[in-house]
Amino acid sequence: MSLSQQSISIIKATVPVLQVHGVNITTTFYRNMFKANPQLLNIFNHSNQREGKQQNALANTVLQAAIHIDKLNELNLAPIVHKHVALGVLPEHYPIVGTNLLGAIKEVLQDAATDEILGAWGEAYGVIAQAFIDAEAALYKVTEEQIGGWRDTREFIVDRKVEESSNIISFYFKPADGKPIATYIPGQYITIKVPLTLENGEQRTHIRHYSLSDTPSEQYYRISVKKEDALKKSDPNGVVSNHLHANVKVGDKVLLSPPAGDYVVDQLSSNPILLVSGGVGITPLLSMAKATLAKQPEREVTFVHSSKNKQYQPFANELSQLEKSNKVKVSTVHSETDGQITKDKLEKFINPSQIKDTKVFICGPVSFMSAINKQLIELGYPKENISYEIFGPLTNV
């Protein structure tokens, strides 16, 4: 199914309007959709809604769709498709989203949202929604039919809790049914669903993605969770992470969705790898480093990690083991004593002759990734060779 040329022209003409009113439209969209369909609150991240992150992310997605409406095949749907499958998004959710999105456009733009504009966007949404539905159906099928695979959630038991630093704990999960578990590509995440009671007594399912932090195993999954400081009831950032730290114990059961995500190392490539992480952003990169050492011991890996100080430095022993292998070059920076990672410091860690061929993976706070990304580009790393993972709604760095 393709869009008519008339609809393409109309949507292109709405780009300036979306640049001005996009966030207002998506904010209105979420408000109206949740009011009419409160069950969807069990799919979306409440903190991201409260902080406006999800609204901004959706506004950017809609804007990019409008800009590329004549070349939708150029849009990278994979990150969103993986998120949707991890969250359990189904085909029947798309008409709900479409109805509320068009309604929000009309509510915000009022008379400027003519029948012609709404018709064009309705047609476009149908095409885009079908592209997502088809891609998600294919991913659901592959995920479910692989060895040890499953669909939706599966019950796991907390086998171990290990303190990695003063604010990070690793959780080891084994399947409650004792059956095989699906493997994963280093860099992927699993999704945990936690029922929590809100202040008003209402119970909601909170869903969070956590990077898998170990090399793939046939016996367990490992995630490593940071405890958030100064949690307030009025501002419940880290509500799931802090719940895991405080209340989830060895022997408890949890519900997990299968591994997902497209932020992964190409294990068929021999290109050098540069890993740069900040704080708990180390988790997917540690998995990449350990798996590469195990499967491609001759592949060059440089790992640069920044943490506040030794107290907050996670996985010190595992980083030491990587370094002792003489196959992975490890550098740690403690910002309290060493300062932030700078372009000059990065130059000391890297091999200048490999810059053009190196695949780079960055993970950490958005401000950290933005700074590192800028420094790497200034050093000559091709933009297309730099990948980053954001713990939250998709955005640019």
From Swiss-Prot:
Residues 2-137 form the Globin domain. This is Flavohemoprotein A. GO terms for cellular component: cytoplasm; phagocytic vesicle. Belongs to the globin family. Two-domain flavohemoproteins subfamily. It comes from the Eukaryota. Induction: By submerged conditions, in growing cells. The gene is fhbA. Its EC number is 1.14.12.17. Residues 151-266 form the FAD-binding FR-type domain.
